[in-house]
Amino acid sequence: MTRIKRGSIARARRTKIRFFASKFRGSHSRLTRSIIQQGIRAFVSSQRDRDKKKRDFRRLWITRLNAAIRAIGVGYSYSASIHNLYKSQLILNRKILTQIAILNRNCLYMISNEILKSGV
């Protein structure tokens, strides 16, 4: 039985992963085993940080919204306002509320008055 060396197939596979790792430093861009390991690590880090970015933005929106609610002097906190918002069945998420608070403070004041007027 003759020996098959897989030259072109293996080279194509390594070239493909080497192209991905061409921006890495040192042996992480030259050695195949290191390239594979660093590629896996890069994908894991990117997935983790995408999830972390979602959490960070949510924290930012909550902080901004809390500051805006306390600044307009409606008289209650962020948590109470969100609770009353859900009870009055207004469908506004934190991102939209924060944009309203930044761009048009009067509109946020009117929304909070509507929540208080609805008697929840």
From Swiss-Prot:
Superkingdom of the source species: Eukaryota
CDD domains with a match to the protein in the record: Ribosomal_L20
Subcellular location: Plastid
This protein's GO CC annotations: plastid; ribonucleoprotein complex; ribosome
UniProt keyword list: Plastid, Ribonucleoprotein, Ribosomal protein, RNA-binding, rRNA-binding
Gene Ontology molecular function: rRNA binding; structural constituent of ribosome
Listed GO biological process terms: translation
Pfam family of the protein (one): Ribosomal_L20
InterPro entries given in the database record: Ribosomal_bL20, RIBOSOMAL_L20_CS, Ribosomal_protein_bL20_C
Family indicated by similarity: Belongs to the bacterial ribosomal protein bL20 family.
Role description: Binds directly to 23S ribosomal RNA and is necessary for the in vitro assembly process of the 50S ribosomal subunit. It is not involved in the protein synthesizing functions of that subunit.
NCBIfam families found in the cross-reference section: rplT_bact (TIGR01032)
PANTHER family, per the entry: 39S RIBOSOMAL PROTEIN L20
The protein, known as: Large ribosomal subunit protein bL20c
Organism: Cuscuta obtusiflora (Peruvian dodder)
